[in-house]
Amino acid sequence: MAGPGSTGGQIGAGALAGGARSKVAPSVDFDHSCSDSVEYLTLNFGPFETVHRWRRLPPCDEFVGARRSKHTVVAYKDAIYVFGGDNGKTMLNDLLRFDVKDCSWCRAFTTGTPPAPRYHHSAVVYGSSMFVFGGYAGDIYSNSNLKNKNDLFEYKFATGQWTEWKIEGRLPVARSAHGATVYSDKLWIFAGYDGNARLNDMWTIGLQDRELTCWEEVAQSGEIPPSCCNFPVAVRRDKMFVFSGQSGAKITNNLFQFEFKDKTWTRIPTEHLLRGSPPPPQRRYGHTMVAFDRHLYVFGGAADNTLPNELHCYDVDFQTWEVVQPSSDSEVGGAEVPERACASEEVPTLTSEERGGFKKSRDVFGLDFGTTSAKQPAQPASELPSGRLFHAAAVISDAMYIFGGTVDNNIRSGEMYRFQFSCYPKCTLHEDYGRLWESRQFCDVEFVLGEKEECVQGHVAIVTARSRWLRRKITQARERLAQKLEQEAAPVPREAPGVAAGGARPPLLHVAIREAEARPFEVLMQFLYTDKIKYPRKGHVEDVLLIMDVYKLALSFQLCRLEQLCRQYIEASVDLQNVLVVCESAARLQLSQLKEHCLNFVVKESHFNQVIMMKEFERLSSPLIVEIVRRKQQPPPRTPSDQPVDIGTSLIQDMKAYLEGAGAEFCDITLLLDGHPRPAHKAILAARSSYFEAMFRSFMPEDGQVNISIGEMVPSRQAFESMLRYIYYGEVNMPPEDSLYLFAAPYYYGFYNNRLQAYCKQNLEMNATVQNVLQILEAADKTQALDMKRHCLHIIVHQFTKVSKLPTLRSLSQQLLLDIIDSLASHISDKQCAELGADI
């Protein structure tokens, strides 16, 4: 049968997970018609570019175009188009073309009247045309005729024709240093500088028919960004994102998103980011931001009088920032890259040690098999771009191209850099555990809370993995239950822990927690399952007080990570309207750090007079009023703490420790791999696998044991442990031979996306080396992965001198040794045979 099953008989994965497979996200393309084995797995063995590698491409020669900044770049097909900017002396209106396949620069063919020389304009691509709007024009050398523009030009890539659109009716105010993008057949422009003041208005115009179109001002709502200029915009998932920019005294590092459908702005909060985790980038201007996959990438700009060159990445799904670490071969001061070292040039096939990384292919199944070259010339080194501002960036395929900008000492650059993106299916670990919490399926513990004895159900495995305090409570409750059963002379069941006789679910374990109320405890439980909390409305008193109750529980339960989350949210939410209520509540709950924050907020010069005139101030307790007045008169000395902040352990860290032994006493299911038992936890398996979810819901084995296979194949013990690491805490790193066994596991076990499958395929494509080729050959033979077996034999034949010295060779089966001999015979020519005989 195709799939794992209980000892009472194996049940096909198709039958078990048939209904559950509908839970796979629509964007995930599983091939449900594929073979039950990996016989039909096709692989591509190169060439690849290193993930997160910066590569310095040929710069633009002066005879083609000047070095520049404040220009625009757009991507069309396999070329980058550069328009305008300034070279430090004059404004430009030339159009340059960079071919990304052969890395050649040229002047683009143009006819008609181009836009006047300008900089700080915008350029976008729609259909087969580039549209240029606005900017700052005139003679900067003589400082004459300088003015902002609001004209709109179209450049047709096919004919090279420049055309100005003459628009009737109301026009946007002339501007420069604005943001522009295309969405739903329209050009959208936002903010900028009109020569006197910064703006934050928005306009749009249809691009389908210039005869019938007109400019329309957009009625924006929500948390509209402050007036700003010199900022980038990027569009992802029907939203436009704006990050930082020049806003005078209001400049921040906030990230805003604009919903095109309802024309509403939202400031994306960062209060959920723990201290100790990567913060958002510094506030800046003159930077770039591009979108790729589910990420936004921010590079460069001027940040508080510095020119940083880190690449920051924002995950739209998880709302987190991180600094992208460049690959090891993105060397500072590396050798100049030959001008032909681009996409069209054949890249040599390298060992995994020489690669240092790999590019992720987005297709999981349909790639052609490649060949491996015996010669492996060294790949030229590349450089990281230096910090710069007023450069420009565009995306072609899975790479970002950055051109020009102003570098140190106000020098214009003519450099072109390429950055290789990575593209992996997202990790669904937190979502899967969160789904288990929301569904309340397979709950085996019930917490009885407070004086009202309200009940909240949960899962022993998750709770005991995340909280030592709750683990002790659960252990004590189990011991009391065991003593009670012993006193009542009740028969102790011999089944596996957590499995009642006849396969029925055991009764819930009751755990009393008198110091907790239901609502804050549910927020705490949500954190245990997902490592985050759904933040309520910022600044609303009721919601802030709720998080304060959660904070109190976090302190009592010794959950450092949750404690930090709550503190950051509360401190970010304190304002003039709620500070007194929060301060009084902090005093009542004995939350000294929050109370200190509120007191310091109240006595600020800009706050104090307003606060003491409020009616809420009159109702404060006398001790608190006295404390506020004394603090205002004599502020306590500030003593910065040198103690590092303990941010606690994450969900991933806790689940890793739980699998490695910390959760042994709470196992409630036994997985049998070729007769060898491996205790595990039902709730965790059900959360991560629709197969196990369906089994435990409808086909729970009576003896609490489940046989493990993937189709007709039983994986190796090492591969099985790799699969458990993925299930428990999302680990995808594994030996290549494990990947052969686990390639089909996402399909059979109903994982919620193909992340594991993508990593397995990539692992096989990139990491077959002389050192592990024999182990992979054995796994390929056992799983009947014919392409992989042929590739291993190919490596063995071409590297036989090295392979023959491996001790594993002598432990291969007779059939595999014969396969190696057959392959050697097929590839050795008569001349090589003669040379071999002479050596002997």
Curated annotation (Swiss-Prot):
Keywords, ordered alphabetically: Acetylation, Endosome, Golgi apparatus, Kelch repeat, Membrane, Phosphoprotein, Repeat, Ubl conjugation pathway
Designated name of the protein: Leucine-zipper-like transcriptional regulator 1
Please give the function described in this protein's UniProt entry: Substrate-specific adapter of a BCR (BTB-CUL3-RBX1) E3 ubiquitin-protein ligase complex that mediates ubiquitination of Ras (K-Ras/KRAS, N-Ras/NRAS and H-Ras/HRAS). Is a negative regulator of RAS-MAPK signaling that acts by controlling Ras levels and decreasing Ras association with membranes.
Domain spans labelled BTB = 443-537, 667-736
Query: Pathway, per Swiss-Prot/TrEMBL?
Result: Protein modification; protein ubiquitination
The record's Kelch repeats, renumbered to this chain, cover: 79-128, 130-185, 187-238, 239-285, 295-341, 399-450
- Superkingdom to which the source organism belongs: Eukaryota
Which residues are reported to carry the modification N-acetylalanine?
2
PANTHER family reported for this sequence: LEUCINE-ZIPPER-LIKE TRANSCRIPTIONAL REGULATOR 1 (PTHR46376:SF1)
Query: Region (Disordered): which ranges?
Result: 329-353
Where does this protein chiefly localize? membrane
Tell me the organism.
Pongo abelii (Sumatran orangutan)
- Description of how the protein assembles with itself and partners: Homodimer. Component of the BCR(LZTR1) E3 ubiquitin ligase complex, at least composed of CUL3, LZTR1 and RBX1. Interacts with Ras (K-Ras/KRAS, N-Ras/NRAS and H-Ras/HRAS). Interacts with RAF1. Interacts with SHOC2. Interacts with PPP1CB.
Give this protein's Gene Ontology molecular function annotations. Answer: small GTPase binding
